[in-house]
Design a protein with these regions (language model features):
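C-terminal boundary and immediately downstream tail of ABC-type ATPase nucleotide-binding domains
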Residues: 148-172, 259
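Glycine-centered loop/turn positions within well-structured domains
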Residues: 120, 144, 153, 165, ...
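Non-catalytic connector elements of ABC transporters
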Residues: 164, 175-282
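Residues located in well-ordered beta-strands
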Residues: 142, 154, 170, 216-218
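ABC ATPase nucleotide-binding domains
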Residues: 4, 11-151
Length: 282
């Protein structure tokens, strides 16, 4: 098991930390040396065997913890939010490396249970995803299926960062209407049974546009290399993501357009009625 807090033995060096569970089992010294070398190589710490734990960065310490778990050749590996205490850059780096580590450092019949509150981690690491909310299973399936066809409004909110925008909308004469805005009814919603529905659209599917609809800026949030704009119009609140760092002031007026081919429809009970990818749970 790998915890969110780095748990290593401070009085032991890297090799001794990783070898510890095998020493406890009284495994042959040569086997220990081979297995530790293999595990350290899989987590990118080959050559660090004699380093003291205190000499390592946070990311390196977490890799030592992971190597110690891998060296056991356990059938089930549980990682409890292993990246949460790392800085942004390290999280990005290790998230990419974990996929390679799992494929190289584990046997084919091993199972990895990766717990996270970050939907990006779940989607990027991939595999089978279980969406939980207050202990209740909301949806189970491949990461791609969860992303493309979230079963309910709650799943759509949980499995996206920022959460999927949800707006109260209605269909009238082949138009979608909300907050005095009208957009064309996309083909994938043409057979929608209900007139009134919850419209879902991701932040990345809304763009700034000189010919778009006017909204007011409530907050401009810089996140890495992108800007998240929190906007309002009437009683509706939405977030859009811009793939560059831009400056906005509160109460600025901006115009935006919606990619109607990426609109989701959830019925009044919050269940997916139609998605751009053909999914429906009604």
């Amino acid at each position: 098991m790998v915890y969110q807090q780095f748990i290593n033995y401070p009085h032991l060096n890297v090799f001794e930390n990783v070898a510890f569970p095998l020493k406890q089992r009284k495994v042959d010294d040569q086997v220990i040396a081979d297995e530790v070398t293999k595990s350290l190589k899989s987590v990118g710490l080959e050559g660090y065997e004699n380093r003291k734990i205190q000499e390592l960065s946070g990311g390196q310490q977490q890799r030592v913890s992971l190597a110690r778990s891998l060296v056991k050749n356990a059938k089930i590996l549980l990682l409890d939010e292993p990246l949460v205490n790392l800085d942004y850059k390290l999280r990005e780096q290790l998230r990419e490396e974990f996929k390679n580590i799992f494929s190289q450092g584990l046997s084919e019949d091993s199972i990895v249970v990766f717990s996270t509150t970050d939907p990006r981690e779940a989607m990027e690491i991939n595999g089978e995803v279980i969406v939980l909310d207050e202990g209740k299973v909301l949806q189970v399936g491949p990461a791609k299926e969860i992303f493309e066809n979230p079963k309910t409004l709650k799943v759509a909110e949980i499995s996206n960062d920022p959460p999927m925008n949800i707006l109260k909308a209605s269909i009238e004469t082949n138009k979608i209407k909300f907050e005095e805005i009208e957009v064309e009814l996309p083909n994938h919603l043409s057979n929608l049974k209900e007139k009134n529905f919850n419209l879902g659209i991701r932040a990345s599917d809304i763009k700034l546009s000189d010919s778009g609809f006017e909204f007011e800026v409530e907050l401009a949030e810089i996140s890495g290399s992108e800007t998240l704009l929190h906007l309002k119009r009437g009683n509706s609140r939405i977030i859009i993501s811009i793939e560059e760092v831009l400056n906005f002031n509160i109460h600025d007026k901006v115009k935006i357009s919606f990619n109607i081919s990426k609109i989701y429809a959830f019925n009044e009970n919050g269940v997916l009625s139609s998605s751009p990818f053909g999914g429906s749970y009604v």
